[in-house]
Every structure is written in C-alpha cells, then in structure tokens.
UniProtKB/Swiss-Prot annotation:
Annotated binding of S-adenosyl-L-methionine, by residue: 32-34, 52, 79, 100, 107
UniProt similarity note: Belongs to the methyltransferase superfamily. RsmH family.
Keywords tagged on the record: Cytoplasm, Methyltransferase, rRNA processing, S-adenosyl-L-methionine, Transferase
InterPro entries registered for this protein in UniProt: RsmH (IPR002903), SAM-dep_MeTrfase_MraW_recog (IPR023397), SAM-dependent_MTases_sf (IPR029063)
Biological process, per Gene Ontology: rRNA base methylation
Protein species of origin: Staphylococcus aureus (strain NCTC 8325 / PS 47)
Top-level class of the enzyme under EC nomenclature: transferase
PANTHER family noted in UniProt: 12S RRNA N4-METHYLCYTIDINE METHYLTRANSFERASE (PTHR11265:SF0), S-ADENOSYL-METHYLTRANSFERASE MRAW (PTHR11265)
Name of the protein in its database record: Ribosomal RNA small subunit methyltransferase H
Subcellular location: Cytoplasm
Listed GO CC annotations: cytoplasm
Gene3D superfamilies to which the protein is assigned, alphabetical: Putative methyltransferase TM0872, insert domain, Vaccinia Virus protein VP39
Length: 311
C-alpha cells in the first residue's frame, strides 16, 4: 500500500480557491493526499481528473479515494498529454490544475523501482513501467559526452566529467546493473574532500538520471503551457517543485505569460491580444512550514508557485 505524506497539502489546494461544483485536474496523483483534500471540498457536481503515469499509484489511489470515486476520472498517462486528455473527456476548460513534481515516497522507498541510492536494486527509475528507456540503458549505452551533459544539466553536478569517465571505465569491463554499484562508481569520481559535504554524493547524478529517463523537464514545460490555455478565467494553477531546475522553469513560464507580448508604440488603446494571460499570485515561492518539515524531511526543498488566469 502506498504511504505518502503530501507536501504543503493545504496551501496547494487552498490557493486554487476551490469551487464546490468545479472541475479540477491533479496532474501528479501519486499518493492521492492532495486529491483527497480537494475531493472533500467538492459536492456531487464537482469533478477531479486524476492523472498519473504510474499505474501502481492509480491502483492504490482508488483505495485512498474510495468514498469519492463517483467524482473522479482516473487517467493513466503523462501530464504532457493534457490537451488530448481533456479532448477525450469532452471537457473544454477547467477551474484549476495542480502539480506536485516530487517523486512520491513509495517510488523512492520501494527498492525495486531503482530510484533510491540507499537501497540496492536494478537500475530502472521509470515512472511509467511500460516505457522502454531505463537508467540501465543510459548508464551502460549512452556516450561519455551524453552522460556529462545530463549529469551537469539535470543534476548540476560539478564532477560530471570525472564521474562519466569512471562509469565508462567500469562498463568496459562489465555492465553496471545495480544502484549501489553505481553509487560506488560515483564516489570514485568525486574527490574525498567534496564527498564529505553537500549531502549524499550520488544525489545529483541520481536526480539527473531520473529526469533523463522520464524526460521530466520537457514534459513539465509542455504540460504547464497547455495548462495555462485550459484553465478558465479566474481559475488557478498551483505548482510544487523540488529542485532549482523545475522551479526556474515554472517561474520563467509564469513570468513570460504575465508579461504578455511586446506592445507596439503609439497605440492609443492596448488591444486584448497584448494584455497579460495570467498574474502570479505569489511573487516569491511559498516554502514548507516547520510542521511540514517535522512530518516529511523531503519538504525542505519544496517551493509552491501559483498563477491566476486573466483571459
């Protein structure tokens, strides 16, 4: 059974200004904590579309949400398919959309999934167990240059080249098959002094591999741009991010749509086409409370950004 503590649960949903008969999308169902909190505020005319690319999460969520199943439509898909999902459901616009971009605790804690650098498992890291690309494929078959690129770009790992060289040397002897085997190789590529600070030495490379396997940043960028077009006027979008790459991307997209296109000089009245599409509800991201941190240490890096649609 999934046991997952949702980060900033109240804030994420409360900032949506939930209407009891509204239609909402949970883009990252996970352990269904946010979904349950939202569903408790909807009447029987309200509806939640719950998306997850992990079928196991959906199966478990059905148990968590068993008292509200008549109000939920479950969709096994990637949230980058948002427009198509709504089209298939004959829904044009919704009242609010929210994202929790953290890996759910069960995915981290079930060793077989291969997300954790604390447990030994095969190198997998797929959110969607039906897709082909795995961490094993990347680690053993991608070029040295490609490894350096993803470790640096997605993990912000300053020892990317050294780690990629060690991986290259090891896989020439035999395939690298398990998470703890990879952890030992990563440690070889990081100077002893640097290993003693900044958290677990494998943290950044594992993050980079997870993002690459699941194409996370590209999928989120595709999805959030669709979300902005799919939410009704006065509706809101809430996004919880867990690392600087996601947060920066979310901030940039919201800023871009808040600014709107550049207005030609000399116009007596600004046409609607040049007015902002949205406004940021909070200029600075909301961070986890002490209470959140007591419940869930993973909340330490969480940031919540909210936007309201204007047209």
């Amino acid at each position: 059974m999934f046991h997952h503590i949702s980060v900033m649960l109240n804030e994420t949903i409360d900032y949506l200004n939930v209407k009891e008969n509204g239609v909402y999308i949970d883009c990252t169902l996970g352990g269904a904590g946010h979904a349950l909190y939202l569903l408790n505020q909807l009447n029987d005319d309200g509806r939640l579309i719950a998306i997850d690319q992990d079928q196991t999460a959906i199966d478990n969520a059905k148990e968590v949400l068993k008292d509200h199943l008549h109000k939920v439509t479950f969709v096994h898909s990637n949230f980058r398919e948002l427009t198509q999902i709504l089209k298939d459901l004959n829904i044009e616009k919704v009242d609010g959309i929210y994202y929790d971009l953290g890996v759910s605790s069960p995915q981290l804690d079930i060793p077989e999934r291969g997300f954790s650098y604390h447990h030994d498992a095969t190198l997998d890291m797929r959110m969607d167990q039906t897709q082909e690309l795995t961490a094993y494929e990347i680690v053993n078959n991608w070029s040295y240059e490609a490894l350096v690129k993803i470790f640096y770009r997605y993990g912000e790992e300053k020892f990317s080249k050294q780690i990629a060289r060690r991986i290259e040397a090891h896989r020439e002897q035999q395939p690298i098959t398990t998470t703890l085997e990879l952890v030992d190789i990563i440690k070889e590529g990081i100077p002893a002094k640097a290993r003693r600070k900044g958290g677990h030495p494998a943290k950044r490379v594992f993050q980079a591999l997870r993002i690459a396997v699941n194409d996370e940043l590209s999928a989120f960028e595709d999805s959030i741009e669709q979300a902005i077009e799919l939410v009704k006027v006065d509706g809101r979008i809430s996004v919880i991010t867990f690392h600087s790459l996601e947060d920066r991307l979310c901030k940039q997209v919201f800023q871009e749509y808040e600014k709107g296109p550049e207005v030609p000089r000399g116009l007596p009245v600004i046409p609607e086409a040049y007015t902002p599409k949205l406004k940021r509800v909070n200029r600075k991201p909301i961070t986890a409370t002490e209470e959140d941190l007591d419940d869930n240490n993973r909340a330490r890096s969480a940031k919540l950004r909210v936007a309201e649609i204007l047209k």
